Amino acid sequence: MINKNCKIQKFKYPFPYIKIQDFLDKDFYKNLEISFPKISDFKTSDRSVSRMNYDTTYGDNLYKKLLANNESYRKLHEYIYSSTFIKYFLELFKNNIQDEYNNNFLTEDVLNYQINNQPFEVGHIIGKKEFTNKLEKFLYPRMDLGSGIKGYGKNNGGGGIHIDNPQRLISMLFYIGGYEKIIGGDHRIWKKSNNNNFLDIHETIKPEKNCLIASLQNNLAFHDVNPIEYIEGSRNAFYLAISSSVPVWKKVKRSKFSIKYNKNRVRNSLFQKIKNILN
């Protein structure tokens, strides 16, 4: 399944991320690509995620049908929801994770967490308001399949520059074709400007087939989707993640900058804290 000759590039700045070209074996990848759900399949199925224009995840009827009828997708599902998948990427980011913990940016020693390889974050995406201190601490995987069409990236795909939710340890994007021609749709890596008040583009990554992008979602992991201006077909992708059952990143102080670019992790205002207690 995993191509032993894949090309792995590691980067530390502006935050740890990895690009893996030819990630899957050629024949296995091809089977996934030709069997990827059509837009019409997404339209006629229920959905519980709104990450892309059209998507599906564990528990949805389309996802169940895909696993029941397609051996390649069944094998992919079994791999993603396994300790093998989680350990593979923990090893790739091991030194980065240790550095984040040693510098108190990671509040939990996640490398010593237990692994729950069963679907945990089923359907909707868990946000910062939904966590409690009573949860057992463990790492778990997630996989969503989705398609982006013209306009994707304006109001979805994270809704502009952002960092993922506070439970996300490693986020991944795997491109699986779907289009003949595309303008936009790139994954953009952002960095803080010299005065730390603005963000500048650090790298723009094209949505190339069989390419996987993985990033450690620390508090500098600013990224977004360059909105699709024109496309013949659809930008098909898997969103993959390794997350914690509890928030693991240092809380971010409230400021105009963090409210705008790190809304998923910024500390709640006094009003919001009172509202949460009352609810």
Protein language model regions, located:
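Fe(II)/2-oxoglutarate oxygenase catalytic core
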Residues: M1-N279
